[in-house]
């Protein structure tokens, strides 16, 4: 067994990667690591981080014992000093030593308490304090149902927030225990839940058995059918909060049993049966004892034991050593706090991190339309009118500010005749809201659960309107007889379906207000106009600060991906903050394949000898498209099985295929291979049909778009991707408002920053597309880069190292054909 307990004999590149990761963690740095798909990246990261975790736990334990012994020795030495000259000094030193002793003992006791809790979990024990704290806001609700939409008291003394309420609910330890149980951990974040599940499967291949939990949304983990049927996450979240609020506390259950009450109240009937602390603790025990390692297992156990899997997962996080979580839980400040994620002294791994800056920008974006603002304004006004006698002065101030802000936003949007871009300061001046403190307004909405109250008020108004529509006027006895006599028999009307759940517009409004609390220079407000409505859209221009908040909080951060290059923008972004350049490590792996398994060439001239460069000016020209189509036709017969051709955009793709058809070239290509085209529709079966055809002796071609769904996440291994052809350099559209603003912002932050972003977006997309092929050690493929700009050294340096170092340039088309033929003949004999 090697130094990292790798489950197989590791390749040199895997050992190098694991050593680099371990060193990065030990030195408390930020690492940017590129490891091509097919090189065992996930296993390498897991084995290196788990090896460090084991060693660090042992080091901490040994260090505490050693330090405690040294302190005891120091105290004993101080006690032996009796001379008058040294006595005062000895007393001071002894007091300092005793303070250190207390600190060490607290750490040792905390570790012992944690181990005791794990032992309890393994025995399946659930310790419930006799003095269990009941959720504060549930205490009186069971006995006297309240108006859930009613305004709160002065919000500084308001009811407990959802997080506080859940904390009380989970407070199963004695009040004397001040510090929560927690341990050293690895936070491993990836884009999707399926990728996290794959990581758990990879871990199962190793000898490591850390306490592991996978964070997921309520939509993924909820087992309450009444809630799950709502489908949409925001509706699921709202329903979950509503049912938990309606549930009675443990104290109330005891009171009811003592009174012998059997009648179910309305509140009790609409609570969640799975929100039960004892049953939730059962599920937590399963996680901490390593019996439940996946979201599927946790969900099954939760349903079986009537314990909520979502809250069991949340409660398990502090005591788990490996926490798998989606990007949004780690990278979004509010979500991270809601989950109780503590980064201090822990290690972060961000998988597929090439797009981390765009991901953060997306997580902090917000928008609101005239339709939502109109409905929100109506709700706020009706709410204020309905509760005007209950609103305290402080609450009334904020509610009037909210009404004023909403009204001014709506008036401004309706008055706009064209699209516009503005800073947050400009928006405040345009709306004339300089007197409104948006920070305090957002805080008020958060602490009073205002969105939730409005949702209850909104749903109640909807029900009342439907009820009014269904009500018939009351008739006297004679009127009923006359009406029955005059009326012709009618078929019995079908009952009206229940109203579809609609989210309250206050959630969108609050998200937008939250966005406005970012630094003025860090964001832009875009006003969008369409034929039917207008909207405000907030765009975060500076995700660097948000990323810095995360990485500087942790002990070390590992940014890893199959295509991290070009990484210069990421490095510059991190360096602009409080992170010094010397704190960043970079490492790029070679591929596990041999040079003989990859043919990578730039196609600078087409088959007719003409220079090829696909630019905005040339991409629609018949001469350009004919030369390109003829070259593809000449190349295809020499490539077996599947060929994937990536083009810059859907518009180019459809025009190119139309022209190939006009030229008669498409028909000749189809005689050699079946041709398929990526659809804009997400439900298309093109992939399945291409996969079947590619494995035949004739083979198949798939035309796809760089940046489309086929260029990221799809596995073109073996026969599915014997060749990848990339047409042109897929630069993003510079007329895009978002891109233009981001480039302008980066130009103010660093020299040539906008162009660096422009180049990075293009080359990341190219590297992602190329990375779809060659997915394992014995795979092989050819890569053709159609554009003479790929021959430039500056462009090739932005390719992933394993591609750029192997790319051949300055070849004639005839030589490319000969190399292609030789390449596939040699590999077919292996």
UniProtKB/Swiss-Prot annotation:
[4Fe-4S] cluster binds at residues 222, 240, 272, 308. A motif (DEAH box) lies at residues 351-354. ATP binds at residues 35-42. It is found in: Nucleus. One of its GO terms (biological process) is positive regulation of cell population proliferation. Keywords: ATP-binding, DNA damage, DNA repair, Helicase, Hydrolase, Iron, Iron-sulfur, Isomerase, Metal-binding, Nucleotide-binding, Nucleus. The keyword DNA-binding does not apply. Residues 1-403 form the Helicase ATP-binding domain. Residues 124-140, 157-168 have a biased composition (Basic and acidic residues). Binds 1 [4Fe-4S] cluster. GO terms for cellular component: nucleus. Its EC number is 5.6.2.3. Residues 124-173 are annotated as: Disordered. PANTHER family: ATP-DEPENDENT DNA HELICASE DDX11-RELATED, DNA REPAIR DEAD HELICASE RAD3/XP-D SUBFAMILY MEMBER. NCBIfam families: rad3 (TIGR00604). Required for normal cell proliferation and chromosome stability. Plays a role in DNA repair during replication. This is ATP-dependent DNA helicase chl-1. The lineage of its organism: Eukaryota, Metazoa, Ecdysozoa, Nematoda, Chromadorea. The gene is chl-1.
């Amino acid at each position: 067994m090697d130094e990292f307990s790798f489950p197989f004999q590791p390749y040199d590149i895997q050992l190098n990667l694991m050593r680099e990761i371990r060193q990065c963690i030990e030195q408390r740095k930020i690492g940017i690591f590129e490891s091509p798909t097919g090189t065992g990246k996930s296993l390498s990261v897991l084995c290196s981080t788990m090896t460090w975790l084991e060693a660090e736990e042992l080091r901490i334990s040994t260090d505490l014992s050693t330090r405690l012994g040294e302190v005891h020795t120091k105290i004993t030495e101080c006690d032996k000093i009796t001379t008058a000259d040294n006595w005062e000094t000895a007393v001071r030193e002894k007091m300092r030593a005793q303070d250190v002793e207390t600190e060490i003992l607290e750490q040792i006791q905390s570790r012992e308490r944690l181990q005791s809790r794990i032992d309890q979990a393994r025995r399946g024990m659930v310790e419930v304090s006799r003095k269990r704290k009941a959720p504060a806001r549930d205490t009186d609700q069971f006995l006297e149902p309240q108006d859930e939409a009613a305004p709160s008291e002065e919000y500084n003394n308001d009811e407990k927030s959802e997080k506080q309420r859940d904390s009380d609910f989970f407070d199963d330890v004695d009040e004397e225990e001040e510090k929560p149980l927690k341990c050293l951990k690895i936070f491993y974040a990836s884009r999707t839940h399926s990728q996290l599940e794959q990581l758990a499967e990879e871990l199962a291949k190793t000898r490591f058995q850390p306490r592991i939990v996978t964070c997921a949304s309520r939509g993924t983990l909820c087992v309450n059918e009444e809630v799950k049927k709502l489908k949409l996450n925001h509706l699921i979240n709202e329903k979950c909060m509503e049912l938990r609020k309606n549930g009675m506390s443990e104290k109330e259950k005891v009171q009811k049993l003592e009174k012998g009450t059997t009648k179910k109240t309305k509140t009790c009937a609409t609570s969640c049966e799975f929100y039960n602390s004892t049953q939730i603790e059962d599920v937590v025990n399963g996680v901490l004892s390593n019996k439940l390692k996946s979201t599927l297992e946790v969900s099954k156990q939760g349903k079986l034991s009537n314990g909520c899997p979502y809250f069991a997962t949340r409660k398990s996080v502090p005591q788990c050593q490996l926490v798998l979580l989606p990007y949004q839980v780690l990278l979004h400040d509010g979500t991270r706090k809601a989950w109780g994620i503590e980064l201090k002294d822990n290690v972060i791994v961000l998988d597929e991190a090439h797009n981390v800056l765009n991901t953060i920008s997306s997580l902090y974006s917000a928008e609101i339309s005239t339709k939502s603002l109109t409905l929100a304004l109506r709700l706020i006004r009706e709410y204020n009118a309905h509760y005007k006698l209950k609103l305290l002065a402080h609450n009334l101030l904020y509610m009037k500010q909210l009404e004023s802000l909403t009204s001014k936003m709506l008036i401004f949007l309706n008055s706009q005749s064209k699209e516009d871009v503005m800073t947050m300061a400009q928006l405040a001046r345009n709306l004339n809201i300089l007197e409104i403190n948006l920070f305090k307004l957002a805080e008020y909405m958060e602490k009073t659960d205002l969105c939730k109250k409005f949702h209850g008020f909104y749903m109640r108004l909807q029900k009342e309107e439907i009820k009014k529509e269904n009500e018939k006027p009351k008739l006297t006895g004679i009127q009923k007889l006359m009406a029955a006599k005059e009326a012709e028999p009618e078929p019995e009307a079908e009952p009206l379906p229940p109203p579809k759940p609609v989210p309250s517009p206050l959630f969108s409004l609050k998200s937008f207000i939250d966005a406005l609390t970012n630094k003025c220079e860090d964001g832009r407000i875009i006003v969008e106009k369409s034929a039917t409505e207008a909207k405000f859209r907030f765009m975060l221009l500076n995700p660097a600060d948000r990323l810095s908040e995360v990485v500087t909080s942790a002990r070390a951060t590992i940014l890893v991906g199959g295509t991290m290059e070009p990484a210069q923008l990421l490095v510059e972004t991190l360096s602009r903050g409080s992170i010094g350049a010397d704190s960043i490590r970079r490492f790029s792996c070679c591929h596990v394949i041999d040079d003989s398994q990859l043919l990578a060439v730039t196609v600078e001239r087409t088959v007719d000898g003409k220079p090829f460069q696909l630019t905005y000016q040339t991409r629609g020209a018949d001469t350009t498209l004919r030369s390109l189509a003829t070259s593809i036709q000449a190349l295809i017969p020499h490539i077996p099985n599947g060929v994937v051709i990536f083009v810059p955009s859907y518009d180019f793709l459809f025009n190119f295929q139309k022209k190939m058809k006009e030229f008669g070239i498409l028909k000749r290509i189809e005689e050699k291979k079946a041709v398929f085209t990526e659809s804009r529709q997400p439900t298309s079966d093109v992939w399945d049909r291409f996969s079947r055809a590619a494995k035949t002796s004739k083979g198949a071609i798939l035309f796809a778009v760089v940046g489309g769904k086929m260029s990221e996440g799809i596995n073109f291994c073996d026969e599915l991707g014997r060749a990848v052809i990339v047409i042109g350099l897929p630069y993003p559209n510079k007329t895009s408002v978002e891109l233009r603003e981001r480039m302008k912002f980066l130009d103010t932050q660093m020299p040539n920053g906008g162009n660096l972003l422009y180049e990075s977006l293009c080359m990341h997309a190219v590297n992602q597309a190329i990375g779809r092929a060659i997915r394992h050690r014995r795979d092989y493929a050819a890569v053709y880069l159609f554009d003479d700009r790929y021959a430039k050294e500056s462009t090739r340096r932005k390719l992933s190292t394993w591609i750029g170092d192997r790319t051949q340039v300055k070849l004639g088309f005839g030589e490319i054909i000969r190399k292609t033929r030789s390449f596939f003949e040699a590999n077919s004999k292996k």
